[in-house]
Structure formats: C-alpha cells, structure tokens
Amino acid sequence: MSSQVSSPVRVRFAPSPTGYLHVGGARTALFNWLYARHVGGTLVLRIEDTDLERSTPEMVEGILVGMRWLGLNWDEGPYYQTQRMDLYKAAAEKLVASGHAYYCFCSKEGLEQRRKAATAAGRAPQYDESCRKIGREDAAARKQGGAPCAVRFAVPETGNTKFQDAVFGEVEFANPELEDFVLLRSDGVPTYHLSVVVDDVDMKISHILRGADHISNTPKQVLLYQAMGATLPIFAHVPLILGPDKTRLSKRHGATSVISYSDEGIVPEAFRNFLALLGWTAPEGSPEKLGDEELIKLFSLEGISHSNAVFDRPKLDWFNTEYIRAYPAEKLLPLIQKEWQKVGLTPANPDAQHLVATIELLKPRARNLKDFAGSFKAFFTDDYANDPEAVEKFLKDPAVREMLVELGERYANAGEFTEQSTEQVLRDLAAEKGVKAGGLINGARVALTGQAVAPSLFAVMVNLGREKTVSRLRRAKEIQ
C-alpha cells in the first residue's frame, strides 16, 4: 500500500459544527489553505455534521463566517456529511461483505457492564469481540430478522499498523491495542472513522493536515484505507496549541472563538500571520511579519514543528499594531466604519478625505480597530467621555482651566491656524503666565481629546479645525 500520492494535491478542512471556529481549527484551516496555495492544489471544505444532537445551523454559519473573516477561501464545498449518509452505509455493508467488518448485536447496557467488569479485573476496557465469533450467515439472518445492530471493523489480531507522518516520521501501533471499533451505529449514523475515510477517498484527498490529537485515530483509519483498497494519503499532524501555562488552550486563557478576535479589533492579516507561526517556522532569515504572498511562498510541511505551540496574546497584539500602522488609511476606513456601526457612532464630519487624514494621524497609536470607536472617539464626534484619571491629573488646577479658556480665545482671533502657529500661541501664553508650556499642552490635550495620550497636540488641533478646537477649549472649566 503506497503512501506517496501523486499530484494533483487536494487537501481539506473538515470542522464539526458543534461549536464556533476556534483557534486550533482556524490554524488547521490556515495550514491547509497555505499548503494548497503553495503547491497550486485544491482546498475542500467539508462540514462533519453527523453529530445530530450537537450540530446546529448556527454553528455551521459561525464556521463559515470565521473562515470568510480570516480570508481563507475554499475551492470546493462546503460538503455536508448528513447529505452523504447513503455512502457511509454502503461502505459499511461492503466491508461486512468483504470480511473486514461484522455486525454487532451487543446492547449499550451490556457493553457498559462488560467494560466495568474488565476495568475491575485490571484489564483494558476494550470490546471483547463476542459478536465477531458469530457466523456470517447467522449474523445476516439476525439482522434480517430485525435485530438492532451496529457494524464493527475487524482489527487484525496480530501485527502492527504503521504510517509515515510528514511531521513525526514513522508512527506504529500494535494491532492488539486497537479494539474492534464501531463503523456504523445501530441507528444508522456513521462514526467519525468511517465517514472521514469514505469522504477522503471519495473526494480524492491527497494530504491530511490536522491536529496531533488525531494521531491515535490514524491507525484505525489506515486499516480502513487498506480494507477499502484505497491509496493512503500523506498525513501531517500539526502540534497542539497551548496556553501560556503550557496546558491545552481553553476559554480560561481568554477568547478561543475566531470571531471574538474580530470583535476585539484584530485585523485578519495580523491574525493569519500570528496563526501561521503557531507550529510552523519560516526559513532562517525570514522576518516575523509575513504577508499572504510571503507565507504562501515559504510554507512547507518540512517547516511544521514537532513541539506544541504556545498562544502568546501580547505577540498577537504586536502583530495587530504592526499591520494597522502599515495599512493605508483608505483600507482601514471601511473596517473602522464597522466599529462605528457597532457603537452607533456617526462621524460629525463624514467627508471621506477628512476621515482618511484623521485615521492617518491616529493609526501609529492604535492597538486595535476598537480604539477608533473608543479612545479616539473625540476625533470623530462630540459625544465622547473624558478619562477621569487624565482630568484629575492634568485639569485639577483651576488656573490651568482658566488659561485653556484664554487659549481658546486667542486661537479664535489668530490669523493662521497651522501646527506652527498654534504651538507659538500656546508657548507665548505660557511665557506670559510664567508657567511651563508642558502643563498647558497636557491640559489642552485632555480638553480636546478626553485622553492623556494622543498624537502631537498641534497636529490634533489642525485636524479638529479652528472652530472645534476653540469650542472645546472654551468649555475647559466645565470638564468633569
């Protein structure tokens, strides 16, 4: 049985819609997408929705929304396993007919009792193969007579099952350690092992990139490939993603749903770059910041690590600030407008040219897209809140407030209103009052933006314009 698959390369992302697209699933999707694009292959999207109790249309839509936000376009699908049930049933019956599987009439209660007895006796709680001993004709007659039954795979009782993994090398399991696993439940619903292999064979999947937690499933699937007379795909099991405490990434480490990162103002390119480096290493000398073209060009199975990756949130935030700073303001504007819609913000000056200029001024200080609807709100609307700590620190002295009001009057009567002229007016006022210009600058910044930190004060004034600058400075006494 060959494990070398010739072109064309076909990979798949096959999530189960029992939850939203999470970080681990997104990384798997990204690796498949990158590999398909790197080799000019095909990415198939398959929704493994056979868990009828837990799979919901909302979760399916959540996965699709997450994929689209990430920018991971697929070439085929989505295919839904619930629409392919006849294929799985036919495959199970074919395996029974070829002697690779058999009908199991054991009840759930009986199986549970035997497992408990085995555990109590110190034995592995594996299936005892009692139905494997039933003759084919007898089993067929019982099934024909209406006896409820599942279908189990007949695992070879001796020998080993091995496969070559592109990441971990040769992996081998002793067959006696693999119990006769269920292929088709008594209600006709296929198990993961059967449906995934039938689909991968039918869809001509050449490479399977998935989490390392699937390694233990692989020998059973290899046996199924062999029993079906199908060529083995190339397996590449990618390392798990851990939290900072080196335990499996979970909700207690923060957000795990991909869309929650969108809600937090992360831009897709930053998230893709960050995810790509969780378990994959770029060639030596490559920069950390890698756009899509570079990632596609550099990605290879050889670069996938054996070691588990650690989710470093500060690193994600660093990538995000880097990408926001590098974005043209015109590209940021529609993303920021979505943030404004979320909070009901309507820009006081909707002129696109002015908005772009304002974004250009602010983006070097932006940590995420939410900043443009939060701490930068004063640049777009008069309906903003003042930071209490900033007010307490820089506007506590009534004398400063008095000087800011006077500063506003001087700006109202000034000839020019440029960065240079506004700075000169402020410094002249500070000199006349015998105070340091820095204190006046800090107070004016709070009066104009509500924040202690902002871009250059005089650039802020020019961006806001004379009228708004004067109006806000005149209200300095009223700020709370």
From Swiss-Prot:
EC number(s) per entry: 6.1.1.17
InterPro entries referenced in this protein's UniProt entry, alphabetically: aa-tRNA-synth_I_cd-bd, aa-tRNA-synth_I_codon-bd_sub2, aa-tRNA-synth_I_CS, aa_tRNA-synth_I_cd-bd_sf, Glu-tRNA-ligase_bac/mito, Glu/Gln-tRNA-synth, Glu/Gln-tRNA-synth_Ib_cat-dom, GluQ/Sye
Motif residue range(s): 'KMSKS' region: 248-252
Motif 'HIGH' region, chain ranges: 15-25
GO cellular component: cytosol
Lineage: superkingdom: Bacteria
The entry's keywords: Aminoacyl-tRNA synthetase, ATP-binding, Cytoplasm, Ligase, Nucleotide-binding, Protein biosynthesis
Entry GO MF terms: ATP binding; glutamate-tRNA ligase activity; tRNA binding; zinc ion binding
Chain coiled-coil ranges: none
SUPFAM superfamilies in the record: An anticodon-binding domain of class I aminoacyl-tRNA synthetases, Nucleotidylyl transferase
Primary enzyme class: ligase
Broad class of where this protein is predominantly found: cytoplasm
Binding sites annotated in the UniProt record for ATP: 251
GO biological process, one term: glutamyl-tRNA aminoacylation
Catalyzed reactions per annotation: tRNA(Glu) + L-glutamate + ATP = L-glutamyl-tRNA(Glu) + AMP + diphosphate
Keyword Isomerase appears in the UniProt entry: no
Compartments in which it is found: Cytoplasm
Quaternary assembly: Monomer.
Free-text function comment from the UniProt entry: Catalyzes the attachment of glutamate to tRNA(Glu) in a two-step reaction: glutamate is first activated by ATP to form Glu-AMP and then transferred to the acceptor end of tRNA(Glu).
Similarity-based family: Belongs to the class-I aminoacyl-tRNA synthetase family. Glutamate--tRNA ligase type 1 subfamily.
Name of the protein this chain belongs to: Glutamate--tRNA ligase 2
Organism: Koribacter versatilis (strain Ellin345)
